[in-house]
Amino acid sequence: RYNGYSSDMARGVAYGKVDAEKQRLLDTCLEAWRAGMSALRPGMTGAEADVAANEVLKREGYPHMAGEGRGCAHSTGMDPEEEIPVVGPDSQDILVENQTIAFEITLLIPGYAGTRVEDTVVIRKDGPESLTNHPYVCNWYQD
C-alpha cells in the first residue's frame, strides 16, 4: 500500500534447471501478457481487451486461463482486488483513461507447473503505463 492505495504484481520464478516445456510455459505467458498489454486502450470493453492475450494462448495450445475465474485483469485501488472493471471473455465493462487495473496472465499445467505475469497499470490514451518495476524473467539457479 502507498497512501492508502493498493497494487498487485506477480512473476513466475524458475528454480533449478528449466526443461523445454517449462521454458515454453514461461515464454508463452510473457508473450501473451505483452500482447494483451499492447492492446489495452480506453473505450474498449473488457471482452475486447481479453482477445489479444488469448490469441497467443490459443495459438500455443494453452487454454484461456482466467485468473481466479474473472479474466486477465481486475481493478485495483483502495483494495488490491476491486469489483470493476474486469477484463475477461464475457466482460462488458468499459476501460476508462487513467483507470488503474492489475493486468495478469496465468498459465497452469496441473500437477506439473504454473506461472503468472501481472503488473499494476494505468490505462492511457496511447497505451497502458506499467507502475511495476520488477524483472519479467526470474531464474534463481540454473546448471
What residue ranges belong to the model's regions?
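Active-site neighborhoods and metal-handling regions in enzymes and metal-associated proteins
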Residues: 1-143
